[in-house]
């Protein structure tokens, strides 16, 4: 995960102070890039502990098409008992003031992935990868301009594209307009790595490269102390992803609906580093 630490270092050394929507303030650069070879291990950050269960739960929630906080809790914890999730601040700080209730967040990621203007982008992507692997339209977008003002949070990672090599490997590249380097980016890396593995399994391909392209890449001012500690730590060996058996998207979502169905074997990170999420 040296690629991730390099991004942190670039922001520290090259970033400029910026005001932001949350009022916290950031140090920011524009444009960031990283490439991970998934054959070398699963890119879970090791210089602090990754909230793995939350990564899995959120991705399954996206893939299900749900935009409700209650469903996110079920995917993450196996039950809804009002647990805190990474979407809880967005619900409490934005969604409620927009008039939403009962856990609704508006037409966020899941809605766009599974019903963008009536199109199920995920099913179309899977079919395209199977039937037209060399196609150049293997792309999913969450940036629905007509519905941005209805979302509790417009998408930070707003699109991804897939590529199939001649020898049966699957690559995935995602694009992100706003990159919270300390809390968000490790989560996003793991999420899209998991998505690449899931898509590869559903299409009979082998996961290969995961590529990240970021826009406004920033460290919040109140995260800087933790980041400076993190970049001093030496990365440890990457874990191996162990997934449950599933034959299609329905099987994945209906029979493996809890995050504990997915494991990181050999994951031995440095201790957790805590910080407040700006919403």
Curated annotation (Swiss-Prot):
> Where along the chain is the active site annotated?
156 (nucleophile)
* One function term, GO molecular function aspect: thymidylate synthase activity
Q: What is its EC number?
A: 2.1.1.45
Which amino acid positions bind (6R)-5,10-methylene-5,6,7,8-tetrahydrofolate, per UniProt? 180
Copy out the induction comment: Expressed in the early phase of the viral replicative cycle.
Record field: catalytic activity: dUMP + (6R)-5,10-methylene-5,6,7,8-tetrahydrofolate = 7,8-dihydrofolate + dTMP
Query: What keywords were assigned to this record?
Result: DNA replication, Early protein, Methyltransferase, Transferase, Viral DNA replication
Chain sites annotated for binding dUMP: 21, 136-137, 177-180, 188, 218-220
Q: Among its keywords, does the record have Thylakoid?
A: no
What are the BP-aspect GO terms?
DNA replication; dTMP biosynthetic process; methylation; viral DNA genome replication
Would the keyword Methyltransferase turn up in this protein's UniProt record?
A: yes
**Family to which the UniProt record says this protein belongs:** Belongs to the thymidylate synthase family.
What does this gene product do?
Sythesizes the thymine necessary for the viral DNA replication.
Among HAMAP family, the record links this protein to: Thymidy_synth_bact
Q: What is this protein identified as?
A: Probable thymidylate synthase
Can you name the source organism?
Escherichia phage T5
Which gene does this sequence derive from?
A: thy
């Amino acid at each position: 995960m040296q690629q991730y630490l390099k991004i942190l270092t670039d922001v520290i050394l090259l970033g400029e102070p910026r005001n932001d929507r949350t009022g916290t303030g950031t140090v920011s650069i524009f444009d960031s890039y990283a490439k991970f070879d998934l054959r070398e291990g699963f890119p879970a950050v090791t210089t602090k502990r990754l909230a793995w269960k939350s990564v899995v739960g959120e991705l399954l929630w996206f893939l299900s098409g749900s935009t409700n906080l209650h469903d996110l809790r079920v995917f993450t914890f196996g039950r809804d008992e009002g647990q805190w999730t990474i979407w809880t601040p967005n619900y409490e700080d934005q969604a409620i003031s927009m008039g939403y209730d009962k856990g609704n967040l508006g037409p966020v990621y899941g809605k766009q992935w599974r019903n963008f203007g009536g199109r199920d982008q995920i099913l179309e992507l899977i079919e395209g990868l199977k039937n037209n692997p060399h196609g150049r339209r293997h792309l999913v977008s969450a940036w629905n301009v007509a519905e941005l003002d209805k979302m509790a949070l417009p998408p930070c990672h707003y699109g991804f594209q897939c590529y199939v090599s001649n020898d049966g490997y699957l690559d995935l590249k995602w694009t992100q307009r706003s990159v919270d380097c300390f809390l968000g980016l490790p989560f996003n890396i793991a999420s899209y790595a998991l998505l690449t593995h899931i898509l590869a399994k559903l299409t009979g391909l082998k996961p290969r490269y995961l590529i990240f392209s970021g826009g406004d890449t920033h460290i919040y001012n109140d995260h800087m102390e933790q980041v400076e500690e993190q970049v001093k730590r030496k990365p440890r060996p990457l874990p191996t992803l162990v997934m449950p058996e599933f034959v299609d998207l329905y099987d994945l979502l209906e029979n493996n609906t809890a995050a504990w169905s997915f494991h990181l074997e050999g994951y031995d990170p440095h201790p957790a580093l805590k910080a407040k999420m700006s919403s």
